[in-house]
């Protein structure tokens, strides 16, 4: 549904809160549809020097405002899982290893999926293909000692067929194999959302507003929403 939301003293058709994978895709699709778009991100734009500093110093890497830390890597420790977040323009894509696996065909035949009556493979395959193109997926051409260990472990467990090269959103011509994907790629090899979806959206007129945290949403009587945003 299309609404008008007041942001920063002006009206836009669409406000996207968060600039990670979901926010990046939403921003681009609405911009392609000709709508005016603002993307609100509580973190800042992360430059190469920020990533270099984060790779050397945890205080420059971690996001924990309550402790005075304003990096871009955040962890939430829950009861059964630890969640890693990226806080910056690009969201979680800043701090992931760019591994982009697709579900195997048999995943869609599991009872929980077939019960819906939807042809999930047919529905989702075109979107997986579009995302793979946009994120520049390539198969990792490199192997090393760790790969050999994994292959050996898979062999011992009787699942050797599950070991294979990994598809990743990385330009391997630019990759130096430093292994620092999770603290940000300083070499520009990782195709993070800020360099793909958001870049394309901005070229179409979308505005990305860093350091913008949404505190409150208010539905307007005449339609649309008012957002209270703080720096």
What does each model-identified segment do?
Residues 49-50, 106, 174-175, 220-221:
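Short Asp/Glu-rich motifs
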Residues 52-56, 178-182, 223-226:
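Short low-complexity, flexible loop/linker segments enriched in glycine and/or proline
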Residues 87-90, 176, 222:
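Short, solvent-exposed loop/turn segments at the edges of secondary structure
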Residues 216-231:
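Conserved beta-strand-loop-beta-strand element in the redox core of flavoprotein oxidoreductases
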Residues 112-214:
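Conserved redox-cofactor binding core of oxidoreductases
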Residues 1-110, 229:
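N-terminal glycine-rich phosphate/pyrophosphate-binding loop and immediately adjacent elements
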Residues 4, 25-28, 196-198, 213-216:
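Generic recognition of flexible, low-complexity loop/linker segments
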Residues 35-36, 202-209, 218-222:
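Secondary-structure transition/capping motifs at alpha-helix termini
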């Amino acid at each position: 549904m299309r609404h008008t939301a007041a942001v920063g003293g002006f009206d836009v058709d669409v406000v996207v809160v968060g600039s990670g994978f979901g926010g990046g895709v939403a921003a681009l699709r609405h911009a392609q549809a000709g709508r005016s778009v603002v993307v609100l991100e509580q973190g800042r734009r992360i430059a190469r020097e920020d990533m270099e500093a984060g790779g050397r110093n945890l205080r420059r890497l971690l996001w924990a405002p309550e402790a005075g830390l304003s990096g871009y890597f955040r962890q939430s420790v829950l009861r059964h899982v630890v969640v890693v977040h990226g806080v910056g323009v690009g969201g979680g894509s800043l701090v992931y290893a760019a591994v982009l696996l697709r579900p195997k065909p048999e995943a869609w035949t599991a009872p929980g999926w077939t019960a819906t009556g939807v042809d999930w493979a047919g529905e989702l395959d075109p979107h997986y293909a579009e995302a793979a193109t946009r994120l520049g997926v390539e198969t990792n051409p490199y192997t090393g000692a760790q790969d050999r260990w994994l292959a050996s472990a898979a062999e011992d467990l009787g699942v050797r067929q599950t070991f294979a090269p990994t598809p990743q959103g990385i330009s391997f011509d630019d990759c130096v194999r430093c292994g620092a994907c999770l603290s940000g790629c300083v070499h520009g090899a990782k195709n993070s959302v800020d360099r793909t979806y958001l870049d394309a959206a901005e070229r179409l007129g979308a505005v990305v507003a860093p350091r913008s945290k949404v505190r409150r949403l208010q539905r307007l009587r005449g339609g649309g929403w008012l957002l209270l945003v703080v720096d």
